[in-house]
Amino acid sequence: MGASGSKKRSEHSQGLRERLLRARGGGYVKQRNASGGESSQSQEGSGREQKSPSCEGQQYQQGEFMNTPWRTPAAIGQKNSYKQQNMDDVDSDDDDLVGVPVMPRVPLREMTYKLAIDMSHFIKEKGGLEGIFYSRERHRILDLFLEKEEGIIPDWQNYTHGPGTRYPMYFGWLWKLVPVDISQEAEEVETNCLVHPAQTSRYDDEHGETLVWRFDPMLAYSYKAFILHPEEFGHKSGLPEKEWKAKLKARGIPYSE
């Protein structure tokens, strides 16, 4: 039974990368790294680099983090709007979501630390996210895919604010967002299209950076988002309210009173 379930999951997941790439263009493009050199992103995945730590799973609680669209009671309308947007995406982008069931295949459940670890490695092994340009549309596709295929409630995928590397705010999710400089050759040849994510990603981002997903297994052991930016967790940060609000204000990050 286990092998059969694993096979079915593998078959369903193989189309995730294709759906993401069809969302306004591909993700294979030359990029400039921090040292000034160029690198091309391959579409092949690899196996796990490290085993998941033996830790107790952490469950999501409403209001726990800062940038989920519905973290406060006052944002219920935003939550409903976000869910409606996911539904609209299915209607408007059917070609991008071929094979995604309308209803979840399994009962709905909250994301946990262990589940985030497992899903991160599973997606990596299938070549899912590595080097793909981030966009709001692709963010929703990933949410929708894991909701319909794995029953994971889409309230977990959140990243720290920029500029710079954006770390996942859900401990256990091993994919971070890294800003890249697109090479001139890539812009002229491969991404000479206004709707390509290499072009639109910078407009999605408030800091004007082009972001790509990168797998980082060390995020299973180090809660980078909380270590580097505790103020983004608000009351959960353990900081005095005046202090975390002052830090958010200094960084230009909005917060609810």
Swiss-Prot record:
Main location: host cell
Region: Disordered, residue numbers: 1-70
Composition-biased stretches (Basic residues): 1-10
Chain spans, region Mediates dimerization: 140-156
One Gene Ontology MF term: GTP binding
Region called Acidic, residue ranges: 88-96
Keyword annotations from UniProtKB, A to Z: AIDS, Host cell membrane, Host membrane, Host-virus interaction, Lipoprotein, Membrane, Myristate, Viral immunoevasion, Virulence
Residues covalently joined to lipid (N-myristoyl glycine): 2
Motif PxxP, residue range(s) on this chain: 104-107
Subcellular localization(s) per the UniProt record: Host cell membrane
Classification via InterPro entries: HIV-1_Nef_core_sf (IPR027481), HIV_Nef (IPR001558)
Gene Ontology CC: host cell plasma membrane; membrane
Record field: compositional bias (Basic and acidic residues): 11-21
Subunit structure: Homodimer. Interacts with host CD247/TCRZ; this interaction induces down-regulation of cell surface TCR/CD3 complexes.
Family: Belongs to the lentivirus primate group Nef protein family.
Additional information: This isolate is from a Gambian case of 'neuro-AIDS'.
UniProt free text on domains: The N-terminal domain is composed of the N-myristoyl glycine and of a cluster of positively charged amino acids. It is required for inner plasma membrane targeting of Nef and virion incorporation, and thereby for infectivity.
Name of this chain's protein: Protein Nef
UniProt source species: Human immunodeficiency virus type 2 subtype A (isolate D194) (HIV-2)
Gene transcribed to yield this protein: nef
